[in-house]
A protein has these predicted regions:
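Glycine-rich helix-loop "coupling/hinge" segments at transmembrane-helix boundaries
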Residues: 35-41, 200-228
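Transmembrane alpha-helical segments of polytopic membrane transport and secretion proteins
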Residues: 1-12, 242
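Single conserved hydrophobic/aromatic residue that forms the stacking wall/gate
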Residues: 236-244
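Amphipathic cytosolic juxtamembrane alpha-helices at the membrane-cytosol interface
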Residues: 2, 65, 89-97, 154-187
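Transmembrane alpha-helices
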Residues: 10, 15-22, 144-147, 155-156, ...
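Membrane-interfacial helix termini and adjacent extracytoplasmic/periplasmic loops
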Residues: 35-37, 44, 109-139, 170, ...
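Short membrane-interfacial helix/loop motifs at transmembrane-helix boundaries
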Residues: 20-54, 204-209
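Transmembrane-helix boundary motif in ABC transporter permease subunits
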Residues: 1-5, 68-100, 117, 173
Length: 244
């Protein structure tokens, strides 16, 4: 009985730790007062002010565009990489998988600084393009991680049978292989999309002047002082328990 009660208390404390910051943001985003210490009544004017802020809206557009484009390109490259690795010998495939996993094992700040130095050495102009390339780079391993297990579950005999029956390689791939790996591809795309939306550190090191995502824009605004509409903006970008 005591053990069960202790477990419930422990679980309750975990949920409080996870959700208390989000609840605080929700309350403050509806507070009519500009000060955090005083409750000035219920209002939605900060949400209206948020959507009237052109800089925030531009940052939102940049964030969504980066997430969609990087996820699509990373999914395409990652899927092709999985198909290529599946035809390799086991030793070569293991080595390549190890190399592919390095970006996931690295601290984000290491990846961000490395990419920044690479772009500087290449003389690249920092902006939307450098952020997009960076997001594609760190998203590809997550796509491979999602697609590769589906590739390993494939029965090569079905693909070979389709070829023996006169199907072209392209037709056999899209009719036999693609339907089986599609769940992994979709999972990889969603993972890449989420990681891109969630990223701050790598974006911060590879963005140019005048180009912001929601995370970097919020960081810039908070340094100037927290405006009430920032609570509303933070609510949309608040971390889930997965991030915590």
């Amino acid at each position: 009985m005591i053990k069960t009660t202790a477990q419930k208390i422990y679980l309750g404390l975990i949920f409080i730790f996870l959700y208390a910051p989000i609840v605080t943001l929700i309350v403050l985003s509806f507070n009519a007062s500009k000060t955090r210490a005083k409750w000035g009544g219920f209002t939605t004017k900060w949400y209206a002010a948020l959507f009237q802020n052109e800089q925030i809206m531009q940052a939102l557009w940049n964030t969504l565009a980066l997430a969609v484009l990087s996820a699509l390109i990373a999914t395409f490259i990652g899927t092709i990489a999985c198909i290529a690795m599946q035809s390799m010998k086991r030793t070569s495939r293991t080595i390549l998988m190890g190399i592919t996993n390095i970006p996931m094992l690295n601290a984000e700040i290491v990846t961000g600084i490395s990419l920044m130095l690479l772009f500087l050495s290449l003389g690249a102009k920092f902006g939307f393009g450098t952020i997009l390339l960076s997001h594609i780079t760190f998203n590809i391993p997550y796509v491979i991680l999602s697609v590769m297990p589906r590739m390993k579950q494939l029965n090569p005999s079905t693909y070979e049978a389709a070829l023996d029956l006169g199907a072209s390689q392209t037709y056999a791939f899209f009719k036999v292989v693609f339907p089986d790996i599609l769940p992994g591809i979709l999972s990889g795309f969603l993972m890449a999309f989420t990681m891109s939306l969630d990223d701050f550190i790598i974006t911060h090191f590879t963005k140019g002047p005048g180009v912001d995502t929601l995370s970097t824009k919020i960081y810039t605004e908070v340094k100037k002082g927290i405006k009430p509409e920032m609570y509303a903006c933070l609510l949309y970008t608040s971390p889930s328990p997965r991030d915590a």
